[in-house]
Every structure is written in structure tokens, then in C-alpha cells.
Amino acid sequence: VLIIAVLFLTACQLIATASYARSERKHPDLRLSSRNSKLSKRCLGSGELCVRDTSCCSMSCTNNICF
């Protein structure tokens, strides 16, 4: 019984891995666009409107303006 359970779980993992790889091949543009959006984010320059310190290049957001 234990051997059958191990074989069943192994088969489930292989099926899940194969379907994940297939979906990545079907939609490579989605993967690239999400990767590019992460790379294209920039910090805000001095004088630009901000919400928090981490969005400013200087890490200083006072009264919603980067310094």
C-alpha cells in the first residue's frame, strides 16, 4: 500500500510540473512583461510627488514631495 501511495504522489508531481511548463511556453509574453515591469521601476527625483520615503531616490519624502 505504501509503494502505491508513493507512486501516486510521484505521478501527481510529474503531471503538475509538466502542466506548469506547458503554460509557461504558451504565454511567454506575459512572463516577459511582468519581468520588464519589475526592471523598469525607478525612483522619484527631487521635487516629484511621493507617498512614502522608499519611492524617492533620496529616500526622503516630506509633505508628499521628494527631497
UniProtKB/Swiss-Prot annotation:
Disulfide bonds join 43-57, 50-61, 56-66. Residues 1-17 form the signal peptide. GO terms for cellular component: extracellular region. InterPro entries: Conotoxin. It is found in: Secreted. Keywords: Cleavage on pair of basic residues, Disulfide bond, Knottin, Secreted, Signal, Toxin. Its main location: secreted. The keyword Transmembrane does not apply. Expressed by the venom duct. Residues 18-40 form a propeptide. It comes from the Eukaryota. Pfam families: Conotoxin. GO terms for molecular function: ion channel inhibitor activity; toxin activity. The presence of a 'disulfide through disulfide knot' structurally defines this protein as a knottin. Belongs to the conotoxin O1 superfamily. This is Conotoxin AbVIM.
